Amino acid sequence: MAKQFLIVGANSSIGKEVFTLLSKDGHEVFTTSRGSFDNPGRHFITEDLSSFDEMEGLPNSLDGLLYCPGTINLKSIQRLQIDDLLADLEVNFFGAFHALKGLLPKLKNEDGGSVVFITTVAANVGMPMHGSISAAKSALQGFAISMGAELAPRVAVNCVAPSLTNTPMAEFLLNSETKIQASEDRHPLKKIGNPTSIAKTIELLMHAKDHGITGQTFNIDSGLSTLKA
């Protein structure tokens, strides 16, 4: 049966892949981003991540919400400023909070729904220079597990925590064969992430309520967070 989903940050690499997968399955997928996106009649340009409750044109109920926006702001503690932390929190955590709160009435309609947040392996493994993004995504993971408890049994809430992924946002970390090889070598499976494989896990989690999955963080990191090999 066709479902109705919303992808926030759909013009991200992972968001595009999830959109493609869900659309191919015959679902109605609404999208938002700060720029244009090829989804006629169902795309909304959102400059303000705090105004989801004011969005017009969405259906009365949603079966799933995916929040994709993220940042990569790598700085040492000596260089980090409060403004850096606030900027990362605004995109990675506060935006997700506003999305869930604003859209919750739609997610709780009818049979309930599933929510997926994208976090990072750095929320689970200590990494140099990741203080700001780790703090922001850790806040999101803590929020997600709390919401999983609070919103049960109507809404399932889960996270996906990728490692370094080959996307335009991470290009500065992967712009040479030497950097790519070094990144792969840090992972037990000797692979870095790619948007397609991450999107396939997210596609499953967009139906998480149907499968009895909630309150979980799925580490898609080639073993980096749990294995020493």
Give a label for each model feature.
Residues T214-A229:
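Short C-terminal tail/terminal secondary-structure segment
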Residues P105, G148-P153, H211:
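Alpha-helical segment proximal to the catalytic Tyr-Lys
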Residues H187-I198:
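A conserved structural motif in NAD(P)-dependent oxidoreductases
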Residues N11, G15-F19:
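N-terminal Rossmann NAD(P)H-binding glycine-rich loop of SDR-like oxidoreductase domains
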Residues S76-I77, Q81-L89, S183:
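Substrate-binding pocket helix/loop in short-chain dehydrogenase/reductase
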Residues A161-F172:
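Short, flexible catalytic-loop segment of classical short-chain dehydrogenase/reductase
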Residues S114-A139, A144-A152, L164-T165:
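Catalytic loop of short-chain dehydrogenase/reductase
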